[in-house]
Swiss-Prot record:
Involved in transcription antitermination. Required for transcription of ribosomal RNA (rRNA) genes. Binds specifically to the boxA antiterminator sequence of the ribosomal RNA (rrn) operons. This is Transcription antitermination protein NusB. Gene3D superfamilies: NusB-like. CDD domains: Terminator_NusB. One of its GO terms (cellular component) is cytosol. The keyword Transcription applies. HAMAP family: NusB. GO terms for molecular function: RNA binding.
């Protein structure tokens, strides 16, 4: 699958996770509704599904990974920033096939697209500290 299709999968995952975080509906229902209502022609749907189920299943674990690096309480995070960070931390901790830099750069781009004005700086700051601990780079 092309990198652009994976990028679109991440974009869709941010939107679906945002909905899930606010609604607290079952993630399978959120996925079904999202796929029924959105144009997913250029999306790696399999990867979208993996991100959704992986983040939902591991959300407490992912939140625990980010907490030490947050400058505020987890509850004070915007829902977009939380979704973006959860996706990046999922990729860093559970998806060795996603290169380190790709996970971080994609998260920054997602925050620029969907987040508040400077949320990409916040996301970058958290991941800059968390990523080397979660997935140490080989020297």
């Amino acid at each position: 699958m092309k990198p652009a299709a994976r990028r679109r999968a991440r974009e869709c995952a941010v939107q679906a996770l945002y909905s899930w975080q606010l609604s607290h509906n079952d993630i399978a229902d959120v996925e079904y509704q999202f796929l029924a209502e959105q144009d997913v022609k250029d999306v790696d749907v399999l990867y979208f599904r993996e991100l959704l189920s992986g983040v939902a299943t591991n959300s407490a674990y992912l939140d625990g990974l980010m907490k030490p690096y947050l400058s505020r309480q987890l509850e004070e995070l915007g829902q977009v920033e939380k979704a973006v960070l959860r996706i990046a931390l999922f990729e860093l901790s559970k998806r060795d096939d996603v290169p380190y830099k790709v996970a971080i750069n994609e998260a920054i781009e997602l925050a620029k697209t969907f987040g508040a004005e400077d949320s990409h700086k916040f996301v970058n700051g958290v991941l800059d500290k968390a990523a080397p601990v979660i997935r140490p780079r080989k020297k």
